[in-house]
Amino acid sequence: LPPSVGGALANLAASFAGRTTVNLNYTAGVAGMGSAAKQAGLRTVVTSRLFLEKAKLTLPEGLEPIWLDEVAAQVSTFDRLTALALALFAPTRWIEAACGAERAPSADDVVTVIFSSGSTGEPKGVMLSHANIASNCAALDQIFHVGPREKVLGILPFFHSFGFTATIWFPATSGLGAVFHPSPIDAPAIGELVERHQISFLLATPTLLSIYMRRIAPAQFGSLRLVLAGAEKLSERLANAFEDQFGIRPLEGYGATECAPVIAASQLDFRAAGFYQPGWRRGFVGQPLPGVVCRVVDPDTFEDLPPNTPGMLLVRGPNVMKGYLGRPDLTEKALREGWYVTGDIALLDDDSFLKITDRLSRFSKIGGEMVPHGRVEEELHKAAGVSVPTFLVTALPDEKKGERLAVLTTMALDAVPSLVEKLSSSGLPNLFLPRADAFVKVDALPVLGTGKSDLRAAKQIASDKLAAR
C-alpha cells in the first residue's frame, strides 16, 4: 500500500493484533516483492485493487489478498462509531482484543520487518521490535516538541523505515496529525496539501526537495516549521538554494533501517532570555538522539578515535534492531558486542555533532588512496554551478590502479571537457578527478523507490557503457 490513511490504519491494526507487518516495496517489481514475501514467509497481503490498477502491479504468486477498498465498503456507521469510542476511551488491551490479538503484544515482539533498500547490495530483512520503534518515536518527540495542532506530511513510502516510523508511529504516539499522499513526486498536489492543511513538518529526501524547488510556489510552503531531509546526503548547495527559494532551511538527519531508523538529527536552535543553544551545524547531521550513543573507531582495529577524527561509526541504543531475518551470519557481522556497525565513515566534533563523510562502500581505492565519491560529486556540482542533482559517481575496476571513477550525468556531454578543466583548478587531488571520457549521459539519475540514489544501477549503467574504454 502507498502512503495513505488506509495503509497507516492497516499497519496499526495489524500491530494491535500482535501481527508482524512487512510493507512490500512495490517499486521493486514482482520479483523483488516475491523475494521479500518468500523470505518473510508471507501468506496474506493487504492491498487495494485501485492501487494495483493505477500502479500496474501484479501480486506475487502464493499470496492471498485482502482487498482494503472492499473491506472499507462494508464498514457501517455503527462500526465507525464503535471504533471511535474504542480509540478515544478504551484501554489498549481492549483495542488489541478488538483487532484480534490472541495475547498482549510484548515490547520485544517484532512489529515489522523492513527490507533494506538494496542500494549497495541485496536487500536484507531488518527485524524491528515494538521497543525499537517506540524508543525512536519518544526521542523524536523530545527534540521536536510537537503539538496536537501540528501536522506532518506523509509522503515517504511505508517500506522506507523513515516513512514507517515518522509518518505512522510518531504521529500515533505523539498526537501529531498526519496528512498522506501516495506519490512523493506529485509536486503540485504536495504544494496544495501543505497549503490547505497548514502542514508544519515536511520529511523528504534531498532528491524530492530538488523536485519541489522546480514545481512548487514559495507561498505554498509558508506554514512549514521544520523541513527534515534524510536517506541521502543533503548538500550545502541544495540546502542554500531551498532556503533562498522557500525561506526555510532544510535540516539534515541521519539514520539506518537497522536503527528504526533515526540515529541523529539536526533540530531548531533553542533560544530563551540569556540562553542560546545551536541545534544544527553546517555540514553536520545533528547530534545523536536521546538514548542513542555513537562511537567513531578505527575500521581495522575498532579502537576509539579522538574527536574530529574520521573513522567507522558504531551505534548503540534501544532503537538498534533485533537482527536480520533468517540471516544470523549477517546479524553477527552487523552487531558487534551490542554496537551496530553502520559501514559509514564519520566524525564526532567536541560537542558531539556528527558528520558523515560517506559510506565505506562509496569510496574507491585508486592507486592505494581512498577517494570519496560524495566529495567528487560535491565538487562537480560546484563546478557546474547547479543546485539540483546532476552527477552520480561510481567506480569501475581498473587493471593499473585497482579502480577508476565513472560519472553518470544528466548534463550534455559536450560540456564535460570544460567542466573537467574547471574541476582540475578547484584544488582537488589528481586522483579525485574523473577523466572526460568517464562520463555517461543519462536521461535521469537512477533512484530507488525510497528516494535514495540507486548505486547498484549506477554501477551497472557505467559498466555497460564504459567497460570497453
Spell out what each predicted region is.
Residues 65-115, 122, 145-151:
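Conserved pre-ATP/AMP-binding loop-to-beta segment of ANL
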Residues 80-84, 88-89, 199-204, 213-280, ...:
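Gly/Ser/Thr-rich phosphate-binding loop
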Residues 16-87, 411-415:
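Structural core segment of the AMP-binding/adenylate-forming
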Residues 45, 202, 317, 322-323, ...:
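AMP-binding/adenylate-forming catalytic core of the ANL superfamily
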Residues 68-69, 403, 428-453:
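AMP-binding/adenylate-forming catalytic domain of the ANL superfamily
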Residues 271, 284-291, 301-333, 369-371:
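Conserved ATP/PPi-binding loop(s) of AMP-dependent carboxylate-activating enzymes
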Residues 134-151, 159-200, 215:
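Conserved AMP-binding/adenylation subdomain of ANL enzymes
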